[in-house]
Amino acid sequence: METNPRKLRSYSYICLIVCIFVLVVCAILSRAEEKEGKGENDDHIPKIYSILVEGEPLAFRASTNINSKAMALEAKKIEEIHDEILGSTLEKGSYTKLYSFKHVINAIAVRTTASQAKKLGKTKGVKAVEEDKGVKLMTTYTPDFLELPQQVWQKISNEGDRRAGEDIVIGFVDTGINPTHPSFAALDLTNPYSSNLSRLHFSGDCEIGPFFPPGSCNGKIISARFFSAGARASGALNSSLDILSPFDASGHGSHVASIAAGNAGVPVIVDGFFYGRASGMAPRSRIAVYKAIYPSIGTLVDVIAAIDQAIMDGVDVLTLSVGPDEPPVDKPTVLGIFDLAMLLARKAGVFVVQAVGNNGPSPSSVLSYSPWVVGVAAGNTDRSYPAPLILDGGQTVQGVGLSGPTLGAPLVQHRLVLAKDAVRTNGSVLQPLTRDIEECQRPENFDPAAVFGSIVICTFSDGFYNQMSTVLAITQTARTLGFMGFILIANPRFGDYVAEPVIFSAPGILIPTVSAAQIILRYYEEKTFRDTRGVATQFGARARIGEGRNSVFAGKAPVVSRFSSRGPAFIDATRSPLDVLKPDILAPGHQIWGAWSLPSAFDPILTGRSFAILSGTSMATPHIAGIGALIKQLNPSWTPAMIASAISTTANEYDSNGEIISAEYYELSRLFPSNHFDHGAGHVNPARALDPGLVLPAGFEDYISFLCSLPNISPATIRDATGVLCTTTLSHPANLNHPSVTISALKESLVVRRSFQDVSNKTETYLGSVLPPNGTTVRLTPTWFTVPPQKTQDLDIEFNVTQVLNKFTFGEVVLTGSLNHIIRIPLSVKTI
């Protein structure tokens, strides 16, 4: 018998490997069986689906009176067809109909199982079935930053903000509105709103309910509805949070509405501190509310129902600071039901504005795809709220936090205590150091005598990254134990973190950079005495927190915000680039003040406050909605495409220093030159957008031709989605008459055409120039032209590949007019 120890160890090792291999295989097989079993059981879990049905919706039928008896009969017929489709296809008791969409889209929302939805997909009269993926939510200074009082409101009326936005209705699909907020009051008896809504070509309704009593629709708010069938069907509604009325329990919808349409000159006072006066972009515009998002749940079918109703009511502008959680996986992005609803809104003459999302700075992170909607990116202004921590000895460390100074400032310094040095002990036994101690999450962790009257240093750790820890918990701990103040420093193990100004009820500062945190910790250790066990026995470090509520205006602006989603837009689940520029435009979206709602269900730290400072593309979007309303007011005959063109072609691509707009990326301390996939056409310039000189018109038929020209999408698919045949196609998708040119795969050469319409009242001569994207040459034909008022002029743009780069590069066409109009057309090209 072999007894060599080395060989025995070898055999044992082989046996061990075999055993591990067998266990791993068994685990994989078990996991696969479990997954397969779950897949089979998933069919018993009802989900929400949107069913696109053949037939034209009511808004696009011959009759123009949507409220006539004839149209009411047509609406009834459509609903009967919907019921027949469901009743004849699905098993009794296997479904719940949530909505019959009849106005701008012909569709059904239904809750049923996957197998039943599959049956519907094969039913005659059904064009498409789409599973509901859910939806998510995507100023005292910005009117001045955009020069509205000086350059825009006075051009519209010599009464300025008293008429800016007059008779324009902006619709908001969001979380509702706080009807008692002063931003939405109608108390100016010297400038009352007309009660005659017929002259606005608008017909809405005011649905009363909890916290939304009669009288909530006051002339400023002219319509308010809520949509909850999808939310109810999801089973996720929380009766204590999700108020079934147009009332905004979260604050988001009120914030968005105030940015676009809030009253002018509203004092922003929080915790007794005056931050300035707020105004919407179009302060005299009317507000129509369509609540479709709740604190606990948001479903796409509720959003579609809200869009459908908004178009029927007759809004001029539609603001969508919401969007699907993710793109459709089984169809082109531009043919998802959300994008189709926006296409039909555009067909109805509504200017639609959509947030591109907050998934930046990753490429192809936009959730806006289609050329018929304006996708808005978010930028920083030059306003900031620095919060200083002044160490004993005079060194100042800058942080972030909207709070007042510590008691006795600027003369009195207070003891600094690191949270882990103030842990409650059990006799001589030290409490084990845990994450929630470092993060100051629970008052019972601390020795009250050590922290009372002290500035406590808390550490940003993994609890904040996994959302188990909150700044609110720190403030509650501070209040319970009587902290003089607190600091939340970056953790060297995790690196820098992103900090936004937060309104603190007690003095507090966020220190988001490791370098600044190390300055504080180094000073602290120099002044702290420890015993042989490392336990702090004497705290010698002193500091004070300075005033953090005063704004400072400095630095370059605008800058593309880190969170703002980036292009290119894509057409399918593989993220193949789409020949459409997204985002379209950049607008202020960082640290924006706006109205809030007292319950603040989304953010408890803001509970009880009437104003909030927030960041997001949700905040950028209403800026463009309000500016669109001003353009519509000045040019009531303009189509949505003309308004979008005016905003795009007049945008600024340079910042306050005269340099190309910069963008934030992953590194907190650095800025990088931005490109069209960061900022779109550039930062909105409202004054120039009011008088663009030339615009690029496009209509519903043009968008259908664009769809029909997209590769790998059959005419049948287009017909099923839109109800329109592909009678004409473009030679290339980039030939859509759009205020930008995006070519996702340029081989050898391509000529695209743009058709401009003069919208001034004087003949003007334009001279063309080109900054070609790298790897191309670009030629214009003609190189100059003269166009009379209201006439059109075609421009051919010829691209030739000089180098295959297999990546997007960027340039622009510039048309300089003899009457000082300047039109910029962004170019984004990938040579292959």
Swiss-Prot record:
GO molecular function: serine-type endopeptidase activity
Disruption phenotype: Seedlings lethality when homozygous due to water loss. Mutant seedling grown under high humidity can survive and show small, crinkled cotyledons and fused leaves due to impaired cuticule formation.
Start and end residues of each PA domain: 425-524
Gene3D superfamilies documented for this protein: 2.60.40.2310, 3.50.30.30, Peptidase S8 propeptide/proteinase inhibitor I9, Peptidase S8/S53 domain
InterPro entries per the UniProt record, alphabetical: Peptidase_S8/S53_dom, Peptidase_S8/S53_dom_sf, Peptidase_S8_Asp-AS, Peptidase_S8_His-AS, Peptidase_S8_Ser-AS, Peptidase_S8_subtilisin-rel, Peptidases_S8_3, S8pro/Inhibitor_I9
Locations listed in the record: Secreted
Annotated Peptidase S8 domain residues: 150-690
Domain Inhibitor I9: 74-138
Effect the entry attributes to changing residue 230 to E: In ale1-2; Seedlings lethality when homozygous due to water loss. Mutant seedling grown under high humidity can survive and show small, crinkled cotyledons and fused leaves
EC number assigned by the record: 3.4.21.-
Main location: secreted
Glycosylation: residue positions: 196, 238, 426, 761, 774, 800
Domain of life: Eukaryota
One GO biological process term: proteolysis
Gene Ontology terms: cellular component: extracellular region
N-terminal signal peptide: 1-27
Catalytic residues, chain numbering: 174 (charge relay system), 252 (charge relay system), 618 (charge relay system)
Keywords in alphabetical order: Developmental protein, Glycoprotein, Hydrolase, Protease, Secreted, Serine protease, Signal
UniProt similarity note: Belongs to the peptidase S8 family.
The protein's role, per its UniProt record: Serine protease required for epidermal surface formation in embryos and juvenile plants. Involved in embryonic cuticle formation downstream of BHLH95/ZOU.
Entry protein name: Subtilisin-like protease SBT2.4
